[in-house]
UniProtKB/Swiss-Prot annotation:
<dbReference type="GO" id="GO:0032543">
    <property type="term" value="P:mitochondrial translation"/>
</dbReference>
<dbReference type="GO" id="GO:0005524">
    <property type="term" value="F:ATP binding"/>
</dbReference>
<keyword id="KW-0436">Ligase</keyword>
<protein>
    <recommendedName>
        <fullName>Glutamyl-tRNA(Gln) amidotransferase subunit A, mitochondrial</fullName>
        <ecNumber>6.3.5.7</ecNumber>
    </recommendedName>
</protein>
<dbReference type="GO" id="GO:0070681">
    <property type="term" value="P:glutaminyl-tRNAGln biosynthesis via transamidation"/>
</dbReference>
<dbReference type="InterPro" id="IPR036928">
    <property type="entry name" value="AS_sf"/>
</dbReference>
<dbReference type="GO" id="GO:0005759">
    <property type="term" value="C:mitochondrial matrix"/>
</dbReference>
<feature type="active site" description="Acyl-ester intermediate">
    <location>
        <position position="165"/>
    </location>
</feature>
<comment type="function">
    <text>Allows the formation of correctly charged Gln-tRNA(Gln) through the transamidation of misacylated Glu-tRNA(Gln) in the mitochondria. The reaction takes place in the presence of glutamine and ATP through an activated gamma-phospho-Glu-tRNA(Gln).</text>
</comment>
<dbReference type="InterPro" id="IPR020556">
    <property type="entry name" value="Amidase_CS"/>
</dbReference>
<dbReference type="GO" id="GO:0005737">
    <property type="term" value="C:cytoplasm"/>
</dbReference>
<feature type="active site" description="Charge relay system">
    <location>
        <position position="64"/>
    </location>
</feature>
<dbReference type="GO" id="GO:0005739">
    <property type="term" value="C:mitochondrion"/>
</dbReference>
<dbReference type="InterPro" id="IPR004412">
    <property type="entry name" value="GatA"/>
</dbReference>
<comment type="subunit">
    <text>Subunit of the heterotrimeric GatCAB amidotransferase (AdT) complex, composed of A, B and C subunits.</text>
</comment>
<dbReference type="Pfam" id="PF01425">
    <property type="entry name" value="Amidase"/>
</dbReference>
<dbReference type="InterPro" id="IPR023631">
    <property type="entry name" value="Amidase_dom"/>
</dbReference>
Length: 471
């Protein structure tokens, strides 16, 4: 073995040992590829021609447990899929590998991405690595992804964001979490929760790292019909060039200054607004009153979509099996009760209730109407057009809010409180617009403060460029 590869082997072994040690307490990883696999990947990449562009060369990347990989089980953190081995890599995993990235392993999550605490019956709970005694909530559902970044386990982590899933944990641990516009990144190979809300999410230590991964994943994919075509991307890019302008205007939604927000969070929000003004940005108050109903609409629509998406996990088409020999209907019902966790079962029941014939017109149909109203409300404030709505526009480039009402809470905090934790983040999923959570110092309790920045639909590049000035 040459000295070059001998030194590389030592580096991989040292890094591998460090990863195992760092993750022992926080439990951000559900599986990790072997040291031999990592070494072989490093060697394979090092043999490629120097002129070959590899933006993620030798970067260790983790992916969420609901993203398909051939080298690891893909369980969605559920006993229903605890032995599922995907025969293919998700499109995003293929893209990461082609860019020189090395898949380190999979990260923990709430079962089927339903929850805000990153806990499940299969792998247990991920804890917040920024708290020394490790008894604080890391957020969810992509808590393992953010925790892996905060613990310096990987360069970047790719998860999902259905209602704040990557941004809330990122805010809780003090890293950057990004949800792109709906349709920018392929979801082929990502297990669905709610199709009209699901996006791929990216976490990294800074906006530069997030941007690098986003540029690798941001491309058309014929395997995902909701992924924007090459022609659509070109059209949007050209239109945005024609409409670009200065000075940049920042909108502050006064409706979001609600009583539930902790006073210290409000202080940090105002501090960030002052920073924007001192940097020469124009700041003005805007109104987004309908967006305050986003959480209620999300609960109705997302749970209904989940009811449909998870119907296939009946132990007959997909899913773990019971030993008992019953009729098919009994097998399916019994297995779902046995293998699915309480939070998933609760959401599926609520989704089924909103889709029932006697309720759908009052619940699901009205929720769709309110969702559209939220999209229009955002659109009328932004300067750039959304290309899906032909309505009067405003003059705002970016909207700035806190990422949460309050910081990470002790693990024993009641779940009824935790379910409000992503209220600030859900509206971006509702409207399909890009949103990034960036760290902004710490609160009086020593925990990280997160600031959310949102932009018009498909204006992802400008959003990341703007956010990169602060993180």
């Amino acid at each position: 073995m040459s000295n070059k590869y001998n030194n590389l082997l030592k580096e991989v072994a040292a890094k591998y040992a460090s990863i195992i040690l760092n993750d022992a307490k926080i439990k951000s990883l559900t599986s990790i590829n072997s040291a031999e696999y990592l070494y072989d990947s490093f060697v394979e990449i090092s043999k490629l021609p120097l002129e070959k562009k590899l933006p993620l060369k030798w970067k260790l990347i983790t992916v969420k447990e609901n993203i398909c990989t051939k080298t690891n089980l893909t369980t969605a953190a559920s006993n229903m899929l605890k032995d599922y081995n995907s025969p293919f890599d998700a499109s995003i995993v293929e893209s990461l590998k082609k860019a020189g990235g090395i898949i380190l392993g999979k990260t923990n999550m709430d079962e089927f991405a339903m929850g805000v605490k990153s806990e499940n019956n299969l792998f247990g709970r991920t804890v917040n690595p920024v708290v020394k005694d490790s008894n604080y909530d890391v957020g969810g559902s992509s808590g393992g992804a953010a925790a892996a970044i905060a613990a310096d386990i990987c360069y970047a982590s790719v998860g999902s964001d259905t209602g704040g899933s990557i941004r809330l944990p990122a805010a809780y641990v003090g890293c950057v979490g990004f949800k792109p516009s709906f349709g920018r990144i392929s979801r082929y190979g990502m297990l669905a929760f709610a199709n009209s809300f699901d996006t791929v999410g990216i976490a990294a230590n800074n906006v530069k790292g997030v941007t690098k991964v986003f540029n690798v994943l941001d491309h058309p994919d014929i395997n995902d019909s909701t992924c924007l075509t090459k022609e659509a991307r070109y059209f949007v890019k050209e239109q945005h060039k024609k409409l670009s302008r200065k000075p940049i205007k920042i909108g502050i939604p006064i409706d979001w200054n609600v009583s539930e927000t902790h006073p210290n969070v409000l202080d940090k929000w105002n501090e960030f607004i002052s920073l924007l003004k001192s940097n020469g940005y124009l700041v003005q108050e805007i109104q987004l009153p309908i967006s305050l109903y986003a959480n209620s609409v999300y609960s109705t629509m997302a749970y209904a979509e989940a009811t449909s998406n998870l119907a296939k996990y009946n132990t007959i088409a997909f899913g773990n099996c019971l030993d008992e020999k019953f009729e098919e209907e009994i097998i399916s019902s019994t297995a779902r009760s046995f293998f699915l966790g309480d939070e998933v079962k609760k959401r599926l029941l609520l989704g089924a209730y909103s889709l029932a014939r006697m309720n759908s017109s009052d619940l699901f149909s009205k929720a769709r109407y309110v969702r559209r109203a939220i999209q229009l409300e955002f659109n009328k404030n932004f300067f750039l057009p959304s290309f899906s709505v032909d309505d009067p526009r405003g003059d705002i480039d970016f909207i700035v809010t806190p990422s949460f009402f309050n910081s990470s809470q002790p693990i024993e905090t009641p779940s009824s409180y935790s379910h409000l934790s992503d209220t600030m983040l859900v509206p971006a999923n509702m409207a399909g617009i890009p949103s990034v959570s960036i760290p902004f110092g710490t609160l009086n309790n020593g925990l990280p403060m997160g600031i959310q920045i949102m932009a018009q639909y498909l204006n992802d590049e400008d959003l990341l460029s703007f956010a990169g000035q602060f993180a």
